[in-house]
Design a protein with these regions (language model features):
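Vicinal oxygen chelate
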Residues: 27-35, 62-65, 81-106, 126-131
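Short, ordered coil/turn segments that flank beta-strands lining enzyme active or ligand-binding pockets
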Residues: 69, 110, 133
């Protein structure tokens, strides 16, 4: 057992690894609040280089993708039952510092809303931040601790 705060303990799963196969998760699909799904999708497609896979504002939800990154854009009526009001921030993990810089230049050239330029941070990430039309933030980064 591993002790946690206030005497709470969890079992030592390392001993059971020979018999338990951990479930592998696919990449998460963030839900991005949008005041208008069609306008938001237009920005993600025309400015940020995503593809509209399905949906529209009438249905309240749209799926977009770029490579292995998938996002859902949702309007207020779609979200009202559980209160995801936004804006939110999500992280986009790239494969190298060069990719971070390349994407920054691509988005800057396309007139994306850039919040901060690429910079090596003390926490060992190279990152920049962009925003969408509803001020949701996209933190683009590369973890260079082991590089």
């Amino acid at each position: 057992m591993f002790p946690l705060a206030r005497g709470i303990q969890i079992p030592n799963l390392a001993m059971a690894r020979d018999t338990i196969s951990p479930m592998m998760f696919p990449p998460p699909v963030p839900e991005i609040p949008a005041s208008d799904v069609d306008k938001a999708a237009g920005y993600y497609v025309n400015t940020l280089g995503f593809t509209l896979d399905w949906g529209d504002d009438q249905g309240g939800i749209a799926g977009i993708s770029r490579g292995n990154c998938r996002l859902c854009l949702t309007n207020r009526s779609f979200r009202e039952s559980y209160g995801n009001v936004g804006p939110i921030l999500f992280w986009l993990n790239l494969e190298s510092k060069a990719e971070v810089d390349e994407l920054f230049l691509e988005w800057k050239t396309a007139n994306a809303k850039i919040v901060s330029e690429p910079e090596d941070k003390p926490w060992m990430l190279r990152e920049f931040v962009a925003a969408d039309l509803d001020d949701n933030l996209i933190r683009v980064f590369y973890d260079f601790r082991g590089a």
